Amino acid sequence: MLDTLLIDATPRWLIGQAVAFLALALCIAGFANKDDNKLLLILIAANVAFAAQFALLGSWVSAGITCIVITRIVLARRYHRNLFIMAALLAATIGVTIVGWQDWKDAPASIAGILGTVGMFAFRGSIMRWWLFVAAFFWVLSNVAIGSLGGILAESLVMTTNIITIWRIEMDKRRLALQAD
């Protein structure tokens, strides 16, 4: 990544970095919000910024999959466990990967897209968040591969937030179980 920072500091690269930090700010605003509807709207805006960032940094598979992620956020909430829609989004993710494949740097975004789709459509609660945690890890790898500082920080924030939320969900389950006894 250091070689990217030193060699690729073109105006397009700098704008890509700025857009990534905008996405980071939107992620922070989204996860700080207690209203799920506002969270989803802010996450959609963050993913629009991520798609632009990936395009500016020349990662077309990541940009395409991020556009699919935007669609997934909207559909997963309304059509949870709908296997047809999940399969269509998985096929779109694989299709974008095949059409746009440039090199190994495209693999983490593809894996992240697949894991996130399965997680959001097949699960809820802690299990869904574990899937999203692993998907975020692959988004971190994708951002490392293209040298996106804001993207690395944003996805690391997503991972940290997911771990904290998983812990809180599990603690609530334990409290409820103790109260039931």
What are these regions (language model features)?
Residues 2-181:
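Alpha-helical membrane-protein topology signature
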